[in-house]
């Protein structure tokens, strides 16, 4: 309740960190501020990711990106293997999708070879920890692969962190991630009401993205 009516609450009750966070969000993303702190509905109500900008990301932009995060969601068939490479603009709390590799029926050797041929062994890759052998395979193949840290509520925690960020995506560069990010919606009951929780389907690139930022999320918390 305080978050949605915080201007009516004495500042000393909320604390300066809360006020600073609200004002920071107001400055960098007014629409997110209005939704989260003022209670103004400004989305379609069903989309999980509301702060998405679809546009061309140029080679010149990418050349200047130096805070790179990479993640892997293991898969075979019918579930896809998904690798994503993104950039995080900390000051503006914005994620940019740079590249992806989302495929079926590829061995660890084949996907590792793709990563190395693209030159993407320049940064660590945070992987789904559910397959420790695959993580070890990547390490043996010369990649800096690390297992994501998981715990109770880690999926919800990570998803909320991503939801608060703006996501910039170029359909030409990352068509699979584009489709997932822009169509991923909450489930609804028979009466059309939204069901809490995140559907575990059509979300392989999304899971890869969540793993990529695992260290940031766990280190700095949901409101980082």
What are these regions (language model features)?
Residues 199-224:
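Charge-patterned, long linear interaction tracts outside catalytic cores
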Residues 1-5:
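Conserved small/polar residues in nucleotide/adenosyl-binding loops
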Residues 73-75, 101, 130, 209:
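Anionic group-transfer/hydrolysis microenvironments
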Residues 61-97:
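Acidic, glycine-rich loop-and-beta core segments that form the ion-binding/anion-interacting portion
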Residues 11-75:
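ATPase catalytic-site recognition across NTP-hydrolyzing enzymes
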Residues 31, 35, 175, 203-206:
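Non-catalytic, well-ordered alpha-helical scaffold segments
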Residues 84, 91-200, 219-220:
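Mg2+-dependent endonuclease catalytic cores in nucleic-acid-processing enzymes, primarily RNase H-like
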């Amino acid at each position: 309740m305080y978050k949605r009516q915080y201007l009516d609450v004495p500042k000393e009750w909320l604390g300066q960190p809360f006020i600073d966070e609200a004002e920071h969000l107001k400055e960098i993303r007014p629409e997110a501020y209005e939704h989260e702190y003022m209670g103004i509905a400004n989305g379609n109500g069903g989309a999980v990711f509301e702060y998405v900008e679809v546009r061309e990301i140029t080679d010149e932009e990418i050349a200047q990106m130096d805070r790179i995060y990479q993640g892997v969601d293991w898969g075979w068939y019918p579930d896809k293997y998904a690798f994503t490479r993104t950039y995080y603009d900390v000051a503006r709390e914005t994620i940019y999708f740079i590249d992806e590799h989302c495929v079926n029926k590829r061995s660890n050797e084949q996907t590792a070879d793709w990563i190395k041929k693209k030159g993407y062994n320049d940064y660590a890759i945070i992987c789904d920890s559910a397959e420790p052998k695959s993580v070890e395979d990547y390490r043996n193949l010369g990649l800096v692969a690390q297992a994501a840290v998981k715990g109770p509520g880690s999926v919800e925690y990570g998803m909320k962190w991503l939801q608060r960020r703006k996501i910039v995506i170029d359909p030409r560069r990352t068509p699979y991630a584009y489709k997932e990010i822009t169509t991923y919606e909450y489930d609804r009951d028979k009466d059309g009401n939204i069901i809490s929780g995140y559907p575990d389907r059509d979300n392989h690139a999304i899971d890869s993205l969540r793993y990529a930022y695992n260290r940031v999320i766990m280190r700095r918390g949901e409101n980082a």
